[in-house]
Design a protein with these regions (language model features):
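Non-globular targeting/processing and membrane-anchoring segments
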Residues: 23-55, 161-208
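Bacterial N-terminal signal peptides
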Residues: 10-20
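Loop/turn elements at helix/coil->beta-strand transitions in domains of secreted/extracellular proteins
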Residues: 56-59, 88-92, 119-123, 141
Length: 208
């Protein structure tokens, strides 16, 4: 583990443990596994599905939320990733799978307000039934996946953190998501297909 990532984790733990929110990835969807299409409502009250993006080569899928301090640290970086890669055929989709019963801040209305205030350049989708989060086995916010079109299927090519420094963007040494997308666009295998994610734990309601 790099010293920077260790220090970031330490800061995250101190800042978030008191809220019962901190968590680190223990198990997630397997890199290389297929991803089924989904259809979710965005903050503009439109339904969005992978199939809607004709000609997309892949997607950056980010599980995020409204209240998490770590998720808020990445807003500008997610906007930048969207601006850079959507024109190249790799849109970014942000998904909120947080339980609105546990966290009132995660209401759809608050999602709309956050997207407006922070000027999201990407769709912000409400996973009201938490189905998509479960399918990806997402555990934290922010947690990212790069999925790519392969043999008529969407497959996970990267899973983990956006980069290696949540606190100080200028000190990022490993832009994991950007590097993975660049390698895939160049027709190369992803050199780092999986990393640890860190942030606030996603609480899933018990399935009936």
């Amino acid at each position: 583990m790099s010293r920077t990532l260790a220090s970031v984790r330490g800061l995250a733990g101190l800042a978030l443990l008191g809220l019962g929110l901190v968590g680190f990835k223990t198990e997630t969807a397997v890199v290389g596994s297929p991803v089924a299409d989904f259809r979710l409502r965005d903050v503009n009250n439109k339904t969005v599905a992978l199939a809607d993006f004709k000609g997309a080569k892949g997607f950056i899928v980010v599980f995020t939320c409204n209240h998490c301090p770590f998720a808020k640290l990445y807003t500008a970086r997610l906007n930048a990733l969207s601006r850079k890669y959507q024109p190249l055929g790799v849109p970014l989709l942000a998904i909120n799978s947080m339980d609105t019963v546990v966290y009132a801040d995660e209401s759809f209305r608050n999602m709309q307000l956050r997207a407006q205030i922070e000027k999201f350049t990407f769709p912000y989708l409400h996973d009201a039934r938490q189905t998509v989060g479960r399918n990806f086995r997402a555990e934290h916010t922010p947690q990212t996946y790069v999925i790519w079109r392969e043999n008529q299927q969407w497959k996970i090519k990267y899973s983990g953190a956006v980069d290696d420094n949540g606190v100080v963007p200028a000190q990022v040494k490993n832009p994991y998501v950007a590097r993975a997308v660049d390698e895939l666009l160049a027709g190369q295998p992803v050199t780092t297909p999986q990393t640890d994610s860190f942030g606030c734990a996603i609480f899933f309601r018990k399935q009936l």
